[in-house]
Amino acid sequence: MEVKLADSWKDYEIIDSSLGMKLERWDDIYLLRPDPQVIWDRGDLLKRYPNIHACYYRSNKGGGHWENLRKTKEAWNIHYKNLTFHIKQMGFKHTGLFPEQAYNWNILRDKINNSKREVNFLNLFAYTGGASVAALS
């Protein structure tokens, strides 16, 4: 199996995961969010990491809410290579960016830069615009 990583991040990292939750660092902000792929038990992340800024709690009626545990910026910027993204806590556990997509952004940028011609680009997964920003860079 070939492992494909978005390994050029300096402002983002997955710190830990347990019991359906993923702890991430977004620049200097630590967020704990649900992740249905996390099926293992490494203990309660809220107890193990006192520096968490905010946690997203799902509702049994759908959706959920953020609870700020520490003073948290309303919005902030993170960088990936020469790209800058505006991040904030969104209504459905998201931050406005999917950092794991950076692997695809790299491929997209390489293909466009190596094409030696003008390229028209239609982004059919434009939920955040990350791929569009990468294509333009």
Please state what every model-predicted region is.
Residues 1-6:
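N-terminal accessory targeting/assembly segments
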Residues 8-27, 31-99, 106-109:
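Non-catalytic substrate-recognition/targeting regions of SAM-dependent transferases
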Residues 101, 105, 129-132:
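Hydrophobic alpha-helical segments
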Residues 110-137:
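Conserved SAM/SAH cofactor-binding pocket of Class I
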